A protein has these predicted regions:
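Surface-exposed extracellular loop regions of Gram-negative outer-membrane beta-barrel proteins
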Residues: 1-10, 37-43, 55, 78-85, ...
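Outer-membrane beta-barrel signature, preferentially recognizing the C-terminal barrel domain
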Residues: 2-6, 166-170, 234-314, 333-345, ...
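Surface-exposed loop/turn segments flanking beta-strands in extracellular/periplasmic regions
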Residues: 45-89, 139-163, 248-275, 324-356, ...
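Hydrophobic, lipid-facing positions within transmembrane beta-strands of outer-membrane proteins
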Residues: 3-11, 105-111, 173-179, 196-198, ...
Length: 534
């Protein structure tokens, strides 16, 4: 369900005083009340879940009930204010559902001042302006019954989730100030057009940056041949999801005797909650650089346009693991003291059987995406051949793309359930994998008129000459560094140690498929034709 209310206003104040021509304004307020609902069945879901929101909390399955070691030391650690919360093992299968309540509020205001004038043979048009955006959400967000939480993310050991209200996320305030100058210079029969501008963007509480751009065109042969060029930098601000990600929650099961023969009153669990802030303080605005160079040729009724371009980004947004999102935590395991108390309403004391360092991991927003795009677009309009009453147009494009990541790849192989033998985390070079794609396509359109019977026949022939993708691989078999499960710190890796027992869990040589290096063959051209008679 979506219910919305939108208010818009805009206007122009004409001044016409010297170079100052007018002032334009625009403002809008957009409010949307959203409600969505989801329900599904969780299977193989017998994992621990705690209602605690506090890092280091240790709860049992009965709210407020303490659990002790055999020497009287209390195992449970219940934070103030969480005395009514519990932690328990979820059933293997259950129905879960959640609602998402949103109250989106977006405001926008823009003010533009336009100037125009002439200095000698040069015509000027100057634009100065500013805009402001405010966006946020006052809704309750994702709401679910804590007794039946949504299915957890199986990609991360012990990962869990909690309710989080959208209204707890700060509003985003985005201010922009810009200036643009447009010049038209007549030099005899030649015309030079230049449009240059710069914009400053500021996201409050995040960062700022400048975005310059310039477009220019000049007549090489007046009315026949024009050379065009452009260069610009575009900054993209992150969304609220990237600025204020949810915290990473983990629920480690320290003890569970639910599957034993213990009486129901003596079955219990002990679960430790770990909470980590997933916010990236070093996140910055994504920067995209683009340049173009083109030619426009006009001859009689024929028009030929061709543009070559390049687009590059080295810090695009992504959400992934980083060197800072691996945390080594002590994982304590207990067993119960036997015999159990004769009073079946009393639970047994525990004894510690093992404490092992465990490497937890989560994701964080990053500027790790990079790509390079090069291409050519063309549009050839041959005009209408009057003798046969037929017009011809040919257009097409060629595009080559390379994309990858500036981030490391993390990998290890876990075998068995002995936590004392869990491996370190292998850290592999960022160039471990690069994606490529290439595409060439043309489209021919022929339009024929038959005025005697009032018909127009249009034939379109589209050909995809090349459309393929492939990958290249760097060192994706032997790590260059590793994160120790013992202390969570980063260490350089000596390749000579790859065969040692300590590092067998980060050796990918036996898991990578050698056929990955074989490129697939190029498919033959694909022709699609369409005939339309009107």
């Amino acid at each position: 369900r979506d219910l919305g209310l939108v208010f818009n206003t805009n206007g122009t104040l004409d001044i016409n005083a010297g170079w100052l021509k007018n002032i334009r304004y625009a403002a809008s307020v957009n409010y949307t009340n959203r409600h969505s609902y989801f329900q599904d069945e969780a299977t193989n879901a017998d994992w621990g879940y705690s209602q605690s929101m506090t890092d280091g909390a240790v709860l049992s399955n009965v709210p407020g009930r303490p659990v002790y070691l055999e020497d009287g030391t209390e195992v449970t650690r219940v934070p103030v204010g969480e005395e009514s919360l519990k932690a328990w093992m979820l059933p293997g299968s259950y129905i879960y559902m959640y609602d998402v309540y949103g109250k989106e509020l977006n405001t926008f205001a823009k003010l533009t001042t336009n100037f125009a004038g002439k200095t000698g043979p040069i015509h000027h048009r100057l634009i100065l302006g500013a805009d402001f955006r405010n966006s946020g959400n006052l809704g309750k967000g994702k709401v679910f019954d804590p007794e039946n939480p949504p299915y957890r993310n199986l990609s991360y050991d012990f990962a869990s989730q909690r309710n989080r209200a959208f209204k707890d996320i700060p509003f985003m305030n985005h201010l922009g100030v810009y200036a643009e100058e447009n010049i038209q210079w007549l030099m005899g029969k030649h015309e030079l057009n230049i449009s240059a501008g710069i914009r400053w963007d500021k996201v409050c509480g995040f960062g700022d940056g400048f975005s310059p751009r310039i477009n220019a065109s000049v007549d090489i042969i007046p009315r026949h041949l024009t050379l065009r060029g452009a260069y610009g930098i575009t900054l993209k601000a992150p969304t609220l999801l990237y600025m204020y990600p949810d915290k990473a929650y983990f629920d480690l099961v320290n003890f569970n005797n639910a599957s034993t023969s213990a009486p129901d009153g003596q079955k219990f669990q002990v679960i430790t909650t770990r909470v980590f802030d997933a916010e990236n303080k070093n996140l910055e605005m994504a920067k995209n650089k683009k340049c173009e160079l083109g030619l426009d040729l006009k001859f009689n009724k024929m028009r030929f346009f061709i543009t070559a371009y390049q687009e590059k980004c080295d810090n695009g947004y992504t959400i992934a693991k980083s060197l800072n999102t691996f945390k080594s935590v002590p994982f304590v395991q207990y067993s119960e003291i036997t015999p159990r108390p004769s009073d079946e309403s009393q639970i047994a004391n525990l004894k510690e059987i093992a404490t092992n360092p465990y490497l937890l991991s989560y994701t964080t927003p990053m500027n790790a995406l990079k790509y390079l795009v090069r291409g050519i677009d063309f549009d050839f309009d041959f005009g209408r051949v009057d003798a046969i009453r037929t017009a011809f147009n040919l257009n097409g494009s060629y595009m080559w793309r390379k994309s990858g990541s500036n981030n490391y790849m993390f990998w290890n192989k876990i075998t068995g359930t002995d936590y004392s033998k869990y491996p370190h985390m292998g850290v592999f070079s960022p160039d471990y994998e690069t994606d490529y794609s290439e595409r060439l396509a043309t489209n021919l359109r022929v339009i024929h008129n038959i005025p005697q019977i009032g018909l127009v026949v249009t034939l379109t022939a589209n050909v995809i000459w090349k459309d393929r993708s492939w990958k290249s691989y760097g060192n994706d078999s032997i790590p260059i560094k590793y994160i120790s499960r013992l202390d969570g710190k980063l260490y350089d890796f000596n390749p000579d140690d790859i065969d040692s027992e300590e590092f067998i869990g980060i050796d990918r040589r036996s898991t990578v498929n050698p056929t990955r290096l074989i490129r697939e063959g190029v498919m033959p051209p694909l022709l699609t034709m369409n005939l339309n008679i009107t």
